[in-house]
Amino acid sequence: MLIKVKTLTGKEIELDIEPNDRVERIKEKVEEKEGIPPPQQRLIFAGKQMNDDKTAADYKVLGGSVLHLVLALRGGF
């Protein structure tokens, strides 16, 4: 099924996923398209941060759903 991942800059990335894909796998697909390592990605759907070991189906993600991508950059001093 096709879903979209929207970045904070408004860019939309289209991904083809399966309902039983884990969130971790969705992040890997984002990395393949955008080069953002999964540990830096936070995916939000329906106002909730998605846990890596849950599946798209666990969050009731359907074809046409839009996930929001937030980058979790580690700051250092």
From Swiss-Prot:
One of its GO terms (cellular component) is nucleus. Keywords: Cytoplasm, Developmental protein, Isopeptide bond, Nucleus, Ubl conjugation pathway. The keyword Phosphoprotein does not apply. Cleavage of precursor form is necessary for function. There is a cross-link at residue 76 (Glycyl lysine isopeptide (Gly-Lys) (interchain with K-? in acceptor proteins)). Residues 70-72 are annotated as: Interaction with uba-3. It is found in: Nucleus; Cytoplasm. The keyword Membrane does not apply. Residues 77 form a propeptide. GO terms for molecular function: protein tag activity; ubiquitin protein ligase binding. GO terms for biological process: modification-dependent protein catabolic process; negative regulation of apoptotic process; negative regulation of DNA damage response, signal transduction by p53 class mediator; negative regulation of gene expression; positive regulation of apoptotic process; protein neddylation; regulation of proteolysis. InterPro entries: Nedd8-like, Ubiquitin-like_dom, Ubiquitin-like_domsf, Ubiquitin_CS, Ubiquitin_dom, Ubiquitin_ubiquitin-like. Gene3D superfamilies: Phosphatidylinositol 3-kinase Catalytic Subunit, Chain A, domain 1. Disruption phenotype: Worms either arrest during embryonic development, or show vulval eversion at the L4 stage and burst at the vulva during the L4-to-adult molt. Those who survive to the adult stage display severe defects in terminal differentiation of seam cells, vulva and male tail. The record marks 8, 44 as: Interaction with uba-3. Its main location: nucleus. Belongs to the ubiquitin family. Ubiquitin-like protein which plays an important role in cell cycle control and embryogenesis. Covalent attachment to its substrates requires prior activation by the E1 complex uba-3-ula-1 and linkage to the E2 enzyme ubc-12. Attachment of ned-8 to cullins activates their associated E3 ubiquitin ligase activity, and thus promotes polyubiquitination and proteasomal degradation of cyclins and other regulatory proteins. Interacts with dcn-1. Covalently attached to cullins. May interact with atx-3. This is Ubiquitin-like protein NEDD8. It comes from Caenorhabditis elegans.
